[in-house]
Amino acid sequence: MRRADGRTDEERERHATIGFRTAGPLLAGLVAFALAGALLGWAVMYGVMFLKLMIVDMPSYQCGGSDCPRGMMPASLLAAVFGGGFFVLARLGAHSSGKLLPVGGACGAFLCGALAGLWPGWLALAWLVGPHMDVAWEVGPDRPSSARVLGYWESGPATVVRVRTDGLYAYNTAQGDARWSASAPDRARVCALSRTARSGTGLVGLERQGAPCGSSVAAVDLESGRFLWQRDNALAENATGYDITGVASTHATAVVVEKLGTLVGLGLRDGSERWRVDAPPDCGVSALGASGDRVLAVLECSGESSTGETAWLWAVDATSGSSDWRSPLPTSGPVSAAHILSADPIVVYAAGQDPWGTSGVTVFDADGSRRTVIPIAGPDEDLAFTAFTEGPGPQSMPAFQAVVSGELFISVVNDTKSDRPRGVSAYALADGRRVWHTTFDDGIDMLAPGRDGELTVVTSRWFDQLWRLDARSGTREQKAVVLDGVSLSPLFAVRPTANGGYLFVNLHEDSDEAALFAVD
């Protein structure tokens, strides 16, 4: 029986069966070609990332295991798997659809699959290699080549001042633009600087021909770069360029050292003398620090006392110059190095020359009583928190890889004989016990304060990485950020910026790297 369209029921059923038999292979071919397109896109994407990690992030072209740039080995394996999957699915699509699918349809399905797979493929790749930061701006290397960097100050949230032997240079931390520069006075060079800049004022020690470092002291306004005052400073006859003048400041008082043993308090903004106080006989000042209304000085005494102590911590009132207290440092002999790591709370590092002396970090109460001593060489690990520039000439500001946060002293530590420490530990200021410890796979280049309650740790092996740690627990806040395209000198400082990035200041004296740069 024929229907209105002229076909019988048998003919209609036969045509329907043919349609179903054709649609199945056609749909399978379209899906196979679309998946093949996605896999080819992923293979190219992961292959390019593998080449980038191998060529750019691994200059020696060889690595093994955890030494390899993060994500490199998985990227290479996945690129091969995706490439193989592409060939399998492309052949499957051609076999399934046969001649039913025109070339244009196959190409369209292939292209749609490739485009649809780009975004999820990129998200997976980004997770695999982890977060990255790129250089937002940089300031070129120091010129002239004779200039040597000594240290830096922060002036508010938007200005960093880099101190060199030939002068001071201020930069806007948002774009890296130069704000001002101040050349060293005629026939003089800068040779020392205060570790902190109070009330927008920095102190520098000057060296003139035939006179040692610290023969003059000057104050600089960090908003304008103007020298506020300059003062000749009397030094001992045997002073050398390594007897760095102590320069420190509270909010209203500048403190300098005369003749290696006399503290002089000056008006921070006008340089007028307000007080002076002599150290005990046969004692000289080897380190200076200040905070609030107190000045702290490390004394080294040549005449051995009745109790055998030769090194002391001396506290002086910053307003009147009166001596508050004097407490012995546990070195039991000559001191090879001493630094005031924190003036509030009081944390002092002192290393003894004699093997029977104690080298460690000493914590004092506000009244000068010794609270605890954290040994440099402990039963489980060694503190490894100082980094100095090398070579002759004036001494640069040491970069301390240690942070005092709340009631914790946090330091880079080394529990092996390797030259590259890989651990960070926190010790309680109350009793010196270790509160937490964390270990990294790569060597640690810098530990510094981060954002509120955080620490910043920079590590490197094949590439540079930045980590964020919770200062209270040592917990890592996130996966490490890979620093792309950065040029770090052997000695540098790092601090967070307001826009969520980080500012790096290179401080090595013989460096061709950028003077400073920001990443975001």
Give the residues covered by each predicted segment.
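Blade-level signature of beta-propeller repeat domains, shared across WD40, Kelch, NHL, RCC1
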Residues: V481-D520
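Acidic, serine/threonine- and glycine-rich low-complexity intrinsically disordered segments
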Residues: V264, W275-A428, H437
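Aromatic (tryptophan-biased) beta-strands that constitute blades/sheets of beta-rich domains
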Residues: G19-A28, M45, M49-G93, G117-V161, ...
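Internal/C-terminal transmembrane anchor helices
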Residues: K99-V129
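Repeated scaffold domains used in trafficking and secretory/extracellular systems
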Residues: P69, D142-P157, P185-G200, N233-S249, ...
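Long, acidic/polar, low-complexity amphipathic helices and coiled-coil-like
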Residues: E154-E309
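Structural motif
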Residues: T165-Y169, E207-A218, L260-V264, E304-W314, ...
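Short loop/turn segments that connect beta-strands within beta-propeller blades
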Residues: T173-Q175, D221-S224, G267-G271, D317-S320, ...
